[in-house]
Amino acid sequence: MTKETRQGEQNRPSYKESLNLLKTSFGMRANATLREPELQNFWADKGIDLELGLANKGPSFTLHDGPPYANGALHMGHALNKVLKDIINKFHIMRGHKVHFVPGWDCHGLPIELKVLQTLSNKERQALTPIQLRKKAAAYASKQVKGQMEGFKRWGIWGNWNKPYLTLQKEYESAQVKLFGQMVLKGYIYRGLKPVHWSPSSRTALAEAELEYPEAHTSPSVYVAFSVIHLPQSLSENLIKQGLELPGDEVELSKRLKVCIWTTTPWTLPANAAVSVNSNLDYSFVRHEEKGQILIFATELLEEVSEILGISFKQVANAKGESLKGILYKHPLYERTAPIVLGGSYITTQSGTGLVHTAPGHGIDDFKTGLQNNLEVFCPVDEKGIFTSEAGKFEGLNVLKDANKEIISSLEISGSLLKELPYVHKYPYDWRTKKPTIFRATEQWFASVEGFREDALKAIDDVEWLPESGRNRIQSMVRERGDWCISRQRTWGIPIPVFYKKNTNEILLNKETIDHIENLFAQYGADIWWEFDESKLLPPSLASESHHWQKGVDTMDVWFDSGSSWASVSCQRDELGYPADLYLEGTDQHRGWFQSSLLTSVAVNGHAPYKKVLTHGFALDENGRKMSKSLGNIIDPTVIINGGTNKKTDPAYGADVLRLWVSSVDYSVDVPIGSNILKQLSDVYRKVRNTSRYLLGNLHDFDPKKNSVDIDNLPILDKWMLNRTAEVIDEITLAFEKYEFSRFFQLLQSFCTVDLSNFYLDIAKDRLYVSAPDDPRRRACQTVMALIIEKLAGLISPVLCHMAEDIWQNIPYQLSEESVFKRGWPVSPSNWKRASLTEPISLIRELRTSVNRVLEGCRNRQELGSSLEAGLRLEITNQGLLDAIDFLAKNGDHDVDCIRDWFLVSQLQIGGEPWAEVLISQQFELGVIEISNARGYKCERCWHYEQDIGSCSEHPTLCGRCVTVMNRL
């Protein structure tokens, strides 16, 4: 290059200033840790949160919040649950509904009690009075509520934060006692001796919902032979007919005939009261040749038992289970006898021997069988899981530790042990202490589910369940469940308002006493049960007799607490609906809150407390594992939002990415979350943000009131884009209505990436940047972009609420609404819908995709840089595509709907003679694509290759089109 040429290059005018470049205050980066709190403050200042929903004029919508436990840091389960609720609430707010959402907390129970006790020394614990413990527990729970509340707010959750419900509030406690009283008066509450799930580690009864069932618990299972001392005459005669004659002498018979049982709880053998059989099963009398004994087993299990015991049997007789009733046997550990009785359908041939060791004090089926056969409910185990003196030589042994070993040893010494084997199975554990539980018969308070079971099953049918499988799940649970043990032997809870007569243990629990306690709790709270004596707790009519009565010490199950929320919250606030429109919790709540709420509501009012129930799965790590400290795989939502100590490995994504995750997953099953998933979500978030930024950046000089182009006068490409936007609005609306948020996620991603960025905006760049500012074709595109950005902000607002508001605040022209949430939900205008454009444009887009694939190959081979360096020739064999191109040519705007510009090439030829020099000629399903180097020279302003470059001496490096624009500026 000569000196003169170089000087000429330097003196050329720069055309950058003549282009319409992006201008927007909407940042490329979200800067979420700063910007999101700013937007939340904006909402709070303007009353644009739940206040907006309450001010709406539409129909009411109440999502009743299932109360999280007021203990511990927020985790991904909280995030999944609360964000799902918030997405639904925000959608209803945008639809103009009067939305009610009162956040709640479950504040009573053992975990909080234990947390308080852990802060005290042994001396302080011993000196602690019940009321002191309650005060400390209440303070602890209140502190936890405050911390969790701030976390929920940071996630962008809207709710009535100024008036949440807490199960420790006096108005809640009072309403719960009222509900309890209504169940008492209907005859559904009773006190009885019954085996319940008992936690020795917590020293209290547990409800089914308070249990976990780890898979790998190992129990010592034993096969035991009980010595028979008496046979019913009819059975003896039947055996003789089959050739089996047994001794009539009791001692000799006991040596010869054995009843064989199998149990995984050897520690319950001291409480054995019977052996149960199934009346419909066949049983075999088999000879143990080595010992000369006759053993009784279920016929179907003979082969399995023979293999396990390593003994060869010879069948010598058989009998129906019904005929075994009345056999008497000696207890192998004590000097007492017990009968064989008929049990229920729970006795099967799935495992064991078909004869079931029955201890009514240690099992529900055993208890029921005991009632039918007048068996004693014997339970020689105390609240710590220690054998009492009633267990004889086993007194003082822990039933879950050393008792099994000692009992098995005693069985072996007595000659009763046939086999001991470890048995791995599911076993109930205390969900709080993570330690095994037992069945233990104690005096407890129960809700008689049997009294309203059929009503509950009918109520389930009247509810809409999402997914539908939830209906069968809760129906089977309610159908099969026993009575509900509602009493707990702890201090931190709502007391069961009962009085016992000191001498007789007579129970005092009637409308007068319950009403009095209800009123006291409403005035003072439940603490007065411990602060007042009986003279004040009893109604005035009984105060003079208070010295004869003693108040109870049991508290209510926390599931009764939370299951009363419909009565304590929904029915106490006039604005809230009962039944609620929606309950939404994890799938584990079919046996928890959904069920406890259902049972209390049906018992009192005969219907469910909800119209619709939606359930979600659990949050797992990326490998599908449950999160735990031991695995080191816990994902902390706070770290997702604010970042970790190392921002490179744990960047601050902000609340919207967390919310986007919730919308991206199929929440009806367990859902994964991890660093790789977050990176992918961040990319999607960034794509939506950058697409929005591009739209905003091209509107800096646009005023819809002055510059809009009438929709009927828009080019075909713009009309198609509005039609596609209308389709997306309708599809996303339907997805939200059906709570299919992952469908929203897919539609949003496709709309921003495929429809906008890769197609419409890619084509629009030329007219946006290169045209004169007021060029009609640019104004047409800006008209469409303005319409889209306003709709897009509304569509993403339930999920990406912060981004939606940020977009709204950065729209450069005047809007009549100060917030996107005041605009309301986007609707698709009828004049946007032009179905006739869908098929031809789809065919052309398909062709464009094929062309881009061939151009990309040229770029990869370094034959081309920009696609504008290419010329394109097409041979099209598909008539539908030819018709589409012809439709565009005849009906389109020549300046915008020129198909050459849609392919972003400098020349286009359809059909005609092949070009002499080509880079590639490639067949595809619709014809042939031929790529060559573009003819002409590159325009320095628009970068198109044209043959009229240099025709204007004033602008020798510009094409004719750009010269025209420059002359207008």
Swiss-Prot record:
Cofactor: Zn(2+)
Compartment(s) where it occurs, according to its Swiss-Prot or TrEMBL record: Cytoplasm
Keyword Ligase part of the UniProt annotation: yes
Source organism: Prochlorococcus marinus (strain MIT 9211)
Binding site for Zn(2+): 939, 942, 959, 962
Family under the similarity heading: Belongs to the class-I aminoacyl-tRNA synthetase family. IleS type 1 subfamily.
Gene that encodes it: ileS
Cofactor binding note of this UniProt entry: Binds 1 zinc ion per subunit.
Residues where ATP binds: 629
Name the record gives this protein: Isoleucine--tRNA ligase
Reaction equations catalysed: tRNA(Ile) + L-isoleucine + ATP = L-isoleucyl-tRNA(Ile) + AMP + diphosphate
Record's comment describing the protein's domains: IleRS has two distinct active sites: one for aminoacylation and one for editing. The misactivated valine is translocated from the active site to the editing site, which sterically excludes the correctly activated isoleucine. The single editing site contains two valyl binding pockets, one specific for each substrate (Val-AMP or Val-tRNA(Ile)).
Example GO biological process: isoleucyl-tRNA aminoacylation
